[in-house]
């Protein structure tokens, strides 16, 4: 580093030696993540980490497994450049750059963590097929079909008192755990400032596991259209975030979470 350079130069000048060329560069640091190879290896050996692609590590393998596009890292390093001082990288910056690449390619799907089966009392609309675009900005990709007959799975965290709109389906009133039909139109939902939440069909769903960036796991149900994916595909779970399909195990899809 610079201090040692001055000391070495003083010694070389004093001894009459040719002063070598000094090359200085700073270290790259990331917030709240392990970049030390020795510490990562020790953690892998003692079982703290599952491997070099554990989501808690800052290795290229780890961030690629989560769905961070290679162009994001290239653009980030190019923007930072070579500096003598250390540089700190924030996840907020990485996610912001990566979102530019994922947003146009990631199709949208529903996922409900810790799903709870609900039945809408007073609903008389019969069974209908709800069509929702895979991507609102790319209508040429087609629609997903979500069957609805008055029952659905909701994320446990979304079941609170108030008026809610099940996306593109119906508006419901939740009062003390009792769920009743309120109305159907989006205009009605907007007039009462209803919160809009995702849901998963009772008759067409698949088990989903999402490995988060801290290695914790979210489990739940996703819509049946997820079965059309292949390993490596990146999706956006509405109201949850971007995730990369890592493994298809029996009838369970295992994703790695990228970011919101």
Model-assigned labels for residue ranges:
Residues 1-260:
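Catalytic adenosine-cofactor/nucleotide-binding cores of aminoacyl-tRNA synthetases and other
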């Amino acid at each position: 580093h610079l201090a040692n350079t001055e000391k070495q130069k003083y010694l070389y000048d004093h001894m009459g030696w040719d002063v070598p060329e000094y090359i200085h560069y700073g270290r790259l640091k990331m917030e709240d993540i392990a970049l030390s190879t020795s510490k990562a290896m020790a953690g892998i050996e003692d079982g703290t980490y599952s491997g070099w692609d554990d989501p808690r590590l800052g290795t290229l393998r780890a961030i690629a497994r989560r769905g961070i596009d290679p162009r994001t890292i290239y653009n980030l390093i190019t923007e930072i450049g070579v500096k003598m001082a250390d540089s700190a990288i924030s996840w907020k910056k990485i996610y912001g750059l990566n979102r530019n690449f994922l947003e146009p390619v990631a199709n949208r799907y529903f996922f409900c963590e810790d799903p709870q089966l609900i039945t809408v009392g007073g609903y008389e609309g019969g069974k209908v097929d709800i069509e929702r675009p895979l991507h609102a900005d790319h209508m040429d990709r087609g629609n997903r079909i979500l069957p609805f007959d008055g029952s659905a799975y909701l994320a446990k965290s979304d079941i609170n008192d108030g008026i809610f709109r099940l996306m593109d389906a119906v508006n419901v009133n939740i009062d003390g755990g009792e769920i009743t039909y309120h109305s159907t139109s989006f205009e009605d939902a907007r007039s009462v400032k209803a919160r809009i939440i995702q849901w998963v069909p009772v008759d067409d769903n698949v088990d989903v596991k999402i490995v988060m960036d801290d290695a914790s796991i979210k489990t739940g149900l996703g819509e049946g259209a997820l079965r059309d994916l292949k390993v490596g595909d990146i999706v956006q779970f509405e109201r949850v975030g971007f995730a990369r399909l890592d493994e298809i195990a029996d009838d369970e899809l295992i994703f790695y979470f990228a970011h919101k």
